[in-house]
Amino acid sequence: MITNVSIKNYKSVVDVSLPLGRFNLLIGANGCGKSNILEGIAMGAAASSDKLDYEYFANRGIRVVDPRFMLPAFDDIKSDRISIGFTNGDNSLATFDIFYNKDTKPAHWQDESVSADSFVAYVGENLSLHGRMVKDMIERINKMKSNKNNSQLQNLRLKPIEDDVRIMTVDADLNRFLIYSLEETILRKADDSNRTYPLGRHGEGLFAYLKELSQKTEGEEIFNEIKENLKVLDWFDDMQVPSGQLSMEFNLKLKDSYLAETLNTFDQRSTNEGFLYLLFYLTLVISDETPKFFAIENIDTAFNPKLCREVMKMLIALAKKHDKQIIATTHNPAILDGLDLSDNEQKLMVVQRSVDGYTKVRTLNNKDIVKSDLPLSQLWLRGFIGGLPNNF
């Protein structure tokens, strides 16, 4: 798991260090730089994959603009280099120094960092399968070492190998980093027009992927876990993928517990948007084919305030269970009430602009919270933790 991200000279983010946990929530006023932070991480992920091109940017959630606007536009900042660094515990995974090379035809973004870290990143991407094989081998050897009869294995040192495998695995997760920003019109479409398998950043491919899961033996457990968690919605009774669909048909059969037996099923075209958003997030977190490390913009969209709290608790628990790492943004105070800041794996970060306009980040913990019986949502609304406009 990535434990820290440093971003320098990306748009309004001049110099920010972001300590990460399992679930990380960014709050702040409109225009404070929350999306810029997410894009900076995506920029580093693009560099780690050696895919610094505009098509890749768009598919990963980076807003494609004139290269001049990818760099800070402050009078006192003259750097033409974007620097993105990633850390896993005590290990520096990689640091990428990215610049726009105008001397080539066509001009393009380029990573000029050549280091052992970036080499490890390359190895991690291309040998992730071997990494898993070595990891399995290490586990088996450790079991053999525990047997005192295997005296020849007692002094075998595996720690350096274990560290390398861990770095390779984490870096492979970084390469798939994606910023999800759902759109109802796209989410509701029943097609498979998706450039990022299995789920697109706006909601593409959801029904095609659920159909695929329903047709695989190993997908049944995932499908059932998704259904079980959908029961947080009081009306939800069941969800099935109808048999006999044509290859290009992608429909769901949903059952409402309140409706009469003669008319209690319908497809996704008739359901509410909150259900669709929740279905997508559950699929994203539970599936083992989706990215391990990703971001969600405006995670509160389409949810009732009370549901926001329960969805947060649910997604955090599922992220721990399925080894996912999530960064989310919100403007809805109710989302904060699903956080438990006594858990070090849950982070609340306040994003704001400095007097010079730079984006800065402050991580809150229990010691920073005013002693009060008020929930976090009310502490935010009343201005005790920041993250609000201060010009009115």
Regions inferred by a protein language model and the residue ranges of each:
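C-terminal lobe/lid and adjacent interdomain/linker elements of RecA-like ASCE P-loop ATPase modules
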Residues: 56, 60, 73-74, 310-392
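Pre-Walker A-like glycine/lysine-rich segment at the N-terminus of P-loop NTPase domains
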Residues: 1-64
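Conserved ABC ATPase signature
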Residues: 231, 235-306
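Conserved P-loop NTP-binding catalytic core
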Residues: 39-104
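Electropositive, glycine-dotted interaction segments
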Residues: 81-241
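Short loop/turn elements that form and flank the Walker-type P-loop nucleotide-binding site
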Residues: 1, 14, 19-21, 289-290, ...
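Well-ordered beta-strand positions in beta-sheet-rich domains
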Residues: 15-20, 93-97, 265-267, 360
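Catalytic acidic motif of RecA-like/P-loop NTPases
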Residues: 11, 24, 272, 300-303, ...
